[in-house]
Amino acid sequence: TFFGGVDRETLMAAERSANGDIVFAGYTWSDDLPTTAGAYQPRYRGNGDGYVAALDGSGSRLLFCTYLGGSGIENLHDMKLDNEGNIVLSGLTDSRDFPTTPGVLQRVYGGGDDDMFVAKLSGDGSRLLFGTYIGGAGWDEGYNLQLLGARGILVSGATNSDNFPVTAD
């Protein structure tokens, strides 16, 4: 099947859900993706946004489609489904208004060219469960992620920030 809008889409990750649906994610320059009723972000915010969508197991019906991003550029690089069917995402953004949530590691853009982001959407694409920047004064890019169950989320990427947030261990 085909999926997309008037410009270009880049597919970065896809997984089958526990019930056989196909969940996929990437980034787009199209402002007319077929977002669905109840989508977390039904409208394109500009300059390249992430997207997350799902098809039924036969690929014949779009279950949901939502954008994810701010007014700048978002490159969504990886996606995993957690044990509850929620959608965990990583990538990079240069948006100063990327959607973040209370209580996360970093609610404010760190500076430089771009920051890494990690976000979690509900399994139906209707709610942002959390969103955070991870970055310092340089460029910071999230490429891959692994879910570690109760231990958290492991994100790999690249940085040239000398003040990138690190842990002691």
What is each stretch, according to the model?
Residues 1-169:
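A sequence-level/structural motif corresponding to short, flexible coil/turn segments enriched
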